[in-house]
Every structure is written in structure tokens, then in C-alpha cells.
């Protein structure tokens, strides 16, 4: 995905065109016509021919200085179409002068293969470097300042490519980055959900920067943002989050890179006629490019410095360098730069990192965006193909839903796209008809021979991929969009990775796009999700397929799509499943949402953090002995191990179906923002390998700035939660069927009242600390009056944790009651909670304790027992001290808990 550069002549203004014409006319007076006509064929004596456009053609069309550049001056003309028409007349290989350069054009797969194999591949392993790149992207500061896309072929290029491919674009590294890629894709799809939702809510009056009318999405803008967010996250560590007043680093970078992209689309005179570089100076183009380069340099430098400061801070705190410093590609580069053998190690401005970053960002966005746009356009114009794609996608996810090993039927992952062969065929066919780069450009670094013709060093090569991929000698019905061709025995093995020369959308040879795997995976993931989750229609009927001139193929008319969400129907629990849940021996209660919930659940929080093998075995044993309710959370880091245990329990037949289980999870405060709630739930579902959860909760009545989950929270990260928007996002999760019920945790009466003032769906559950040592009488009364179930945690006082207390298990009152009834103190505490009408979540890992916990339902506490328990001193254990700050929304425990502490 290296940057492609537009280097044919396209006047930047009428002044430039006039100046060039005047220079050409004056030059024709002093330059002998014969000299010009023989200019290209003045090669060393050789037995080979020289590939020259016919003398008659040159005589009638060529101009001094500019050569045949004027043929490509037409703003409405497409260079690949013009070259294709010339190939029809002059054959699959011909050449002509463009300014002061020689240009060789090849248009058949045989000629292209000859260019990109053997010794010729080495000869054509360089690229022309236009003025914009040299001026803006640091390519004018010597070889140690070149980026991967522009550095001449040689040892330094191999070193840089190794760094980029091994640390960012290899299949092994992409596996490590998968969760980051999916997270950013989820964020972008959440915005599509919001567009559909708001369009419905406002009866067609919803308009944002990415919409042009009711329900109509400007897909070009959305895909551009998605591509930038994905590559920006894995390269620079950019985080998506709510916008603040001042422009963020991400916004500054976007502005600078967009300005640079504009200059990259221009064609300075000096790119084709270096001796006329003064024209670019005269028009101010060079000056403006330099100004843009300085701006971009400052932004990228600040981003790299941010990473350096983070690394120093992490080392000062004694953090794990592998975890903290290898979060993105810049971190990896900085680690490598500390090694003495990396080129440019002594360069204080670290220009190689800047160049690589810009290469990755620039090259990683356009190909994905353009190919997806053309693919969607073709699908909208060929509804029968779209219908067949829907059938494949729907069938795959129906099968996945029924699978006992993986019930994540509503969540698309990279493993899914491997099985969707028709989706893969659609993308191949789209790239065949509309390659993002219709002409692949190279520069010969040495003399070579192609097709029997002598090609001097310094010749520009234009490989007309567009023409080659529409060759009727190779493709049946080459102008027809027919993905099924890639399902046939003859062509199903044809690949786009540069080995099949009849299909080269990513180029070939040594300079083939290094990010093929990344681009294909991302395109297939996005296309699959669009087809699975949305109905798509063109608001104007037939989509216009006109492309812009240039070496990158953009649509002239942006693509607008009318999107309607294909709502996932909430999974309705069957009466049989409810009976199975109750027959386990644990009573059930009906929530305000109408869903049935066991009153006793197993907690999965472990103080060691991530879920362990011990925990997986404990969950399996819990299911075996009768537990049907399991509580987890993103912050517990136990979702994955719970998902593994559920899948294994289904395999072993411990439960008949997933519907027999009640699974609750909870986001963390860093995701308590309107645009991150659905993303967080989807990530939890992916970890759990489930289609839905039964209960999804907010953890506290506060938000934190988006970032990693940690208890070491800087005071400046604590912010007030916007109850209205965050709860609306929770409601949308329930409406979409990703959760059956929604609830909160650690909310006081006052904060519940504030939340419900704007809620359409009231919280079904409030999960809070509750035990005989902290009885929550006021909160219980309020929740009962509002049909909110209190779900108790820390029922045993969190004994054994750093914040825990022996107030429950060490209580003399409870010990006496337990002794009198022949029960344990834990059983007495749990029975008391149950008799208050609350559900409870208790963590136990041994089989003995698991069975003991279940034996609380066939006996009762007396009135006298309740009176004695009511006299136990009260004290809160879970204080949430990390949310209290002099400058935050809660300046004291009293403000956080509203005097309920």
C-alpha cells in the first residue's frame, strides 16, 4: 500500500499551460526537428530494437520540450483509457516522450510479466519521485531521509521494507493488531447505526457531515474516516473518542495530510520538464508545498514526541516495556531505532520514522477506500449479485448461530471472511474492472530489454493494468461484472497478490504493495458487515461509474447510499429454556424488562486479573452442579475464559443450549460515552463468543477518558457522565438485540432518579455492594418502588482482597446464627440477601463451596435472626476512591454516594 503518484502532466492553472506552450513554440525555432524525432532512439549500438512510437505519430503530435504531454492535458480524459486506445493501434508495447523523459507503456500480461520478473524486475524496482513528494515528504534530504515508497532500490530499501513488513504488515503482526482493527471498524459502524437511528427518530430530518439527506450516507466520507482510523490506530495509536474544544493531534494530522494529498494530486511542470522548474516557483506551487511540508513535519514530530514521553513515563514507573511500549507501529519503530544498526539512528530529527509513518498512513487508506467504493457501486448496479452475497453471508451466520462451538452469530470476525468465497470473488472482480491504481508506474534504474526492445536507464514505465485486466483474450465478457468467474475451476486460484499477471491491482515484482493482506482483510471485513447489517439502495437509481483522470481511480460523483439497518431480532427465550433454568434448583425472578434471571450467580472476578485455567474449570463445574447465571465484566478480563467454558459446556452436553444460561457483563468507565457503548458491548460479545448477553450494565455513575482499563486513574481523566446520551446508547444495545436487559452498578437513589428522568427503558438491575454488614436499606426501598432489582455483590465482604473486610465472615452475630442452624456464615449471609428480595453474585471456585452456595433455598431465617442481623454495624467496603478528585465531578465520597455511604 505504498503511495501512488500522479505524474502525467495536468496543468495546475491556465497560466502554467500558457507558459509551457510559449516555451514549446520558442524551442521549436532553435531545436532541429530531426534531432527531436531521433532523440529517443539514440541508444547505444545494440542488436535489439528500440521501442518507439511511429515516426508519423511523433511528427504529427509531438511538440518540443513537452513531447506528447498535451495528449493527456484533457481534464475529462482518462490516462488509462487513452493509453488503452493507443495500445489498440500501436500494440502491447510502445514508447513516446513525455517532457524530457522517455516513457514505455506495456498493456498485456505477457509484457507486464517480462517487466516484473528476472533481471527486469531489478531494473524496474524504482519509482519516479515527483516534486510534491520531494518537497513535502522529506525525500530531498539524502537517502537516509527517504521513505519506503520513494527510496531507490537497494540495501537501504530492503532494510526499510523489512522494518515495515515484519513489524506492521506481516500476517503474524496483523494477528496481533486484529483487536485494534476490529475495534476501529466497530466504532465506524456505530456511527452508521446512529445515522439510521437518528434518521428514524427525526422522521428524515437528520443531517450530519456524512449524510446528505434522510438515511442517505456519503459513503466516501465514511470509508475515508474508517480507513484513516484503522491505519491511524495501528500506526500512530490514535484513539477514537468524544471531541473536545481544541483540535486534537488526530484532527491536526488529518488536516495536514489532506492538504498534502491535494498537492500530491497536482502535476508540477518540473515533474516532466525539470528545466522549467521556475514555472512552479513563479506560480507559487513550490512555496505552498514547502509550507505544507513544514506544517506536516511539526504535527508528525509532536506525535512521535508524545510516544517518547509515554515511553519515558512508563519506564519511570517501572512498567512492562513489552505491554506499554509496543502498542503501535511508532512504538515499535522507536524501540528499533534504539538499536545501533538501524539506518538513520544518528539523525536527531528521526526523519525515517516520519517518512515511514506518512507512507503507511497515505498508502494504507486510499486503496481500501477506493476499492470498497467501486465494489459497493457495482453491487448497487447489479442487485442480483448483491442478493447472492446476502444469501452467502446470511447462510454462514445462520450456521454459526447454530454452532455449539461458536455462537457469535451477530459478530463478524476475521475468521468469518475466510469462509465467504463469494465475497472474496466480488472484491476480486471489482479490482479487475476498477483497480484503484489503473496504471502502475516505475522507473528503470539500468538498461534492460523488454519484448525485444532496448529500454535505456531512466525510462519511465507505465503498466496499463486497467487495459490488461479487460483483455478479451484472457477474460470472457471482460466488461461484465461477473464475480462467479472466480468460482470456476479455471480461475478460482487466480490471486491478486502479484503472482498472476493477468490480475495485478496491487502491482507485482519487488515493489509490489506490501500491505496486500491488510487491505484485503479490511475490505472483506467491511463489505461483509455492510451486507450483513444493512439494506443498501442507491437513492438515484443507477450509480454513475465515471472515474476521475489520474493514476488513482476516484469516482467523479461521490457515492451516496440509502441505508436501512437490518435489525437483529432479539433472541426470545423459550418457555422450555426458562423451565430448564429453574429446574437447576435456583429460583428465578422476572426482571422489569420481562426477562427471567436466576437469583444466584457465579462471579468471575479474580484479583489476579485475567481469567485462568483454574477459573475455566470452576465455571464448568459450576454449570455441572446447577449454576446458570454467570457475571463478568470487561474490567475483570474474564470474558474470554467464560466464553471458552460456555462453548465447552455446550460441547459436553452440560446444557442443551445457550438460552439456558444467563450471562451478564459490564463495560468500563472509559467506554461510558455515547459513541463507545455499542463498541464496548460488541467487543465483549466477541470475547465471550456469544450472540447476545442477558444483562449489560454501566459500572459507575462516572465516565473516564477513553483509554486502557486500569485502576491507576489520573485525576484529569475523570469526567461527568452524560446520563441522557450514554443511557440512550445502552437502550440502543437492547433494541438491537445485543442484550436482553440493561442495568447499572453502584448508582445511588439520587443518581438513579437523574438517569431515569430521561430514560425510555428503565434500568432492570442495580448491582451494588450489599451484605449484612452493609444492608443498603434506603437504596433497596427505592429500587423496589421503581421495579429495579438490586443485585448484591461483595455478599461475603470481599474477604481476601486488598480492599476486603472480615466484617461478614468474622461477625459474631452471624456465627451464632450459623451454628444454631447448622449452616456456614457464608450461607447465612447469602440467605439474608435472598430474603431481602435481591439477587446475588458470589465467587467460589471449589466444588465444595459451589455446592454449599446452592443450599440456601430450603430453609429460612427467623424474625429474631433478622432483628439481630439488623444490629450489625454498617460500613461500605467498595468506596470507589479512584473516582473522587478535588477537580472532578465528585469531590468527596459523600458526593459520589449521596450520603448513602
Swiss-Prot record:
It catalyses: (R)-reticuline + NADP(+) = 1,2-dehydroreticuline + NADPH + H(+); (S)-reticuline + reduced [NADPH--hemoprotein reductase] + O2 = 1,2-dehydroreticuline + oxidized [NADPH--hemoprotein reductase] + 2 H2O + H(+). One of its GO terms (cellular component) is membrane. Its cofactor is heme. It holds the Pfam family Aldo_ket_red. Keywords: Alkaloid metabolism, Heme, Iron, Membrane, Metal-binding, Multifunctional enzyme, NADP, Oxidoreductase, Transmembrane, Transmembrane helix. It comes from the Eukaryota. Heme binds at residue 513. Bifunctional protein involved in the biosynthesis of morphinan-type benzylisoquinoline alkaloids. Required for the isomerization of (S)- to (R)-reticuline. The cytochrome P450 module is responsible for the conversion of (S)-reticuline to 1,2-dehydroreticuline while the oxidoreductase module converts 1,2-dehydroreticuline to (R)-reticuline. This is Bifunctional protein STORR. The lineage of its organism: Eukaryota, Viridiplantae, Streptophyta, Embryophyta, Tracheophyta.
Amino acid at each position: 500500500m505504498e503511495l501512488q503518484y500522479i505524474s502525467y502532466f495536468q496543468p495546475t492553472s491556465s497560466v502554467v499551460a500558457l507558459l509551457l506552450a510559449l516555451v514549446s513554440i520558442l524551442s521549436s525555432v532553435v531545436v532541429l526537428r530531426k534531432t527531436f524525432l531521433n532523440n529517443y532512439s539514440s541508444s547505444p549500438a545494440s542488436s535489439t530494437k528500440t521501442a518507439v512510437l511511429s515516426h508519423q505519430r511523433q511528427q504529427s503530435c509531438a511538440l518540443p520540450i513537452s513531447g506528447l504531454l498535451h495528449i493527456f492535458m484533457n481534464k475529462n480524459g482518462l490516462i488509462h483509457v487513452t493509453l488503452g486506445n493507443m495500445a489498440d493501434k500501436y500494440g502491447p508495447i510502445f514508447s513516446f516522450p513525455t517532457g524530457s523523459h522517455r516513457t514505455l507503456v506495456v498493456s498485456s500480461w505477457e509484457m507486464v510479466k517480462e517487466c516484473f520478473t528476472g533481471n527486469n524486475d531489478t531494473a524496474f524496482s524504482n519509482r519516479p519521485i515527483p516534486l510534491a513528494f520531494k518537497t513535502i515528504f522529506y525525500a530531498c534530504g539524502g537517502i537516509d531521509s527517504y521513505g519506503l515508497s520513494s527510496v531507490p532500490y537497494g540495501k537501504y530499501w530492503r532494510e526499510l521494507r523489512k522494518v515495515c513488513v515484519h513489524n506492521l504488515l506481516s500476517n503474524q503482526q496483523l494477528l496481533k493488531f486484529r483487536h485494534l482493527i476490529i475495534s476501529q471498524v466497530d466504532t465506524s459502524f456505530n456511527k452508521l447505526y446512529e445515522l439510521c437511528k437518528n434518521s428514524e427518530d427525526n422522521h428524515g430530518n437528520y443531517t450530519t457531515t456524512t449524510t446528505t439527506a434522510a438515511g442517505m450516507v456519503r459513503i466516501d466520507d465514511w470509508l475515508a474516516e474508517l480507513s484513516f482510523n484503522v491505519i491511524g490506530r495501528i500506526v500512530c495509536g490514535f484513539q477514537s473518542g468524544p471531541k473536545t474544544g481544541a483540535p486534537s493531534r488526530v484532527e491536526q494530522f488529518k488536516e495536514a495530510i489532506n492538504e498534502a494529498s491535494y498537492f500530491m494530486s497536482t502535476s508540477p511542470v518540473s515533474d516532466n520538464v525539470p528545466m522549467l522548474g521556475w514555472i512552479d516557483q513563479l506560480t507559487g506551487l513550490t512555496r505552498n508545498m514547502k509550507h505544507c511540508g513544514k506544517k506536516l513535519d511539526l504535527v508528525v514530530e509532536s506525535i512521535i514526541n508524545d510516544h517518547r514521553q509515554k515511553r519515558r513515563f512508563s519506564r519511570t514507573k517501572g512498567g512492562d516495556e513489552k505491554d506499554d511500549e509496543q502498542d503501535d507501529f511508532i512504538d515499535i519503530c522507536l524501540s528499533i531505532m534504539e538499536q545501533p544498526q538501524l539506518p538513520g539512528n544518528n539523525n536527531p530529527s528521526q526523519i525515517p520514522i516520519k517518512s515511514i509513518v506518512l507512507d503507511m498512513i497515505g498508502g494504507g487508506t486510499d486503496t481500501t477506500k477506493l476499492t470498497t467504493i467501486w465494489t459497493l457501486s457495482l453491487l448497487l448496479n447489479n442487485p442480483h449479485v448483491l442478493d447472492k452475497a446476502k444469501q452467502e453471508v446470511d447462510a454462514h451466520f445462520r450456521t454459526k448461530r447454530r454452532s455449539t462451538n461458536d455462537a457469535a452469530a451477530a459478530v463478524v470476525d476475521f475468521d468469518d471472511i475466510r469462509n465467504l468465497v463469494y465475497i472474496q470473488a466480488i472484491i476480486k472482480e471489482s479490482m479487475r474492472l476498477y483497480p484503484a491504481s489503473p496504471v502502475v508506474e516505475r522507473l528503470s534504474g539500468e538498461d534492460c530489454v523488454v519484448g525485444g526492445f532496448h529500454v535505456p536507464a531512466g525510462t519511465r514505465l507505465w503498466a496499463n493494468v486497467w487495459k490488461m485486466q479487460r483483455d478479451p483474450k484472457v477474460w470472457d465478457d471482460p466488461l461484465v461484472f461477473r464475480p462467479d468467474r472466480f468460482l470456476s475451476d479455471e480461475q478460482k486460484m487466480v490471486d491478486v497478490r502479484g503472482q498472476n499477471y493477468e490480475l495485478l491491482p496491487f502491482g507485482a515484482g519487488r515493489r509490489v504493495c506490501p500491505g496486500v493482506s491488510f487491505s484485503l482483510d479490511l475490505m472483506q471485513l467491511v463489505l461483509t458487515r455492510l451486507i450483513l447489517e444493512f439494506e443498501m439502495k442507491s437513492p438515484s437509481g443507477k450509480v454513475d461509474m465515471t472515474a476521475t483522470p489520474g493514476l488513482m481511480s476516484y469516482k467523479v460523483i461521490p457515492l451516496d447510499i440509502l441505508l436501512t439497518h437490518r435489525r437483529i431480532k432479539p433472541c426470545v427465550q423459550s418457555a422450555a429454556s426458562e423451565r430448564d433454568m429453574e429446574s437447576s434448583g435456583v429460583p428465578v425472578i422476572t426482571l422489569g424488562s420481562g426477562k427471567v434471571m436466576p437469583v444466584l450467580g457465579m462471579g468471575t472476578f479474580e484479583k489476579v486479573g485475567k481469567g485462568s485455567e483454574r477459573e475455566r474449570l470452576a465455571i464448568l463445574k459450576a454449570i455441572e452442579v446447577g449454576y446458570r447465571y454467570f457475571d463478568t465484566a470487561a474490567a475483570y478480563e474474564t470474558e474470554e475464559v467464560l466464553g471458552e467454558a460456555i462453548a465447552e459446556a455446550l460441547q459436553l452436553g452440560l446444557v442443551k443450549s445457550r438460552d439456558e444460561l444467563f450471562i451478564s457483563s459490564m463495560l468500563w468507565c472509559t467506554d461510558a460515552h455515547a459513541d463507545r457503548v455499542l463498541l464496548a458491548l460488541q467487543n465483549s460479545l466477541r470475547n465471550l463468543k456469544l450472540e447476545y448477553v442477558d444483562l449489560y450494565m454501566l459500572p459507575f455513575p462516572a465516565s473516564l477518558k477513553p483509554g486502557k482499563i486500569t485502576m491507576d486513574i489520573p485525576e484529569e481523566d475523570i469526567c461527568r457522565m452524560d446520563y441522557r446520551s450514554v443511557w440512550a446508547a445502552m437502550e440502543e444495545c437492547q433494541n438491537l438485540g445485543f442484550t436482553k436487559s440493561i442495568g447499572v452498578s453502584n448508582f445511588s437513589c439520587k443518581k438513579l432518579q437523574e438517569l431515569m428522568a430521561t430514560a425510555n427503558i428503565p434500568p432492570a438491575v442495580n448491582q451494588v455492594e450489599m451484605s449484612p454488614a452493609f444492608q443498603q436499606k434506603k437504596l433497596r426501598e427505592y429500587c423496589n418502588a421503581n421495579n429495579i432489582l438490586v443485585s448484591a455483590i461483595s455478599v461475603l465482604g470481599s474477604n481476601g482482597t486488598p480492599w476486603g473486610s472480615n466484617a461478614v465472615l468474622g461477625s459474631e452475630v452471624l456465627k451464632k446464627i450459623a451454628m444454631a442452624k447448622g449452616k456456614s456464615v457464608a450461607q447465612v449471609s447469602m440467605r439474608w440477601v435472598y430474603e431481602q428480595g435481591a439477587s446475588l453474585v458470589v465467587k467460589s471456585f471449589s466444588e465444595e463451596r459451589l455446592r454449599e452456595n446452592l443450599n440456601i433455598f430450603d430453609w429460612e431465617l427467623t424474625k429474631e435472626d433478622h432483628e439481630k442481623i439488623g444490629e450489625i454495624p454498617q460500613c461500605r467496603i467498595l468506596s470507589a476512591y479512584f473516582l473522587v478528585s478535588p477537580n472532578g465531578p465528585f469531590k468527596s465520597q459523600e458526593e459520589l454516594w449521596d450520603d448513602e455511604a
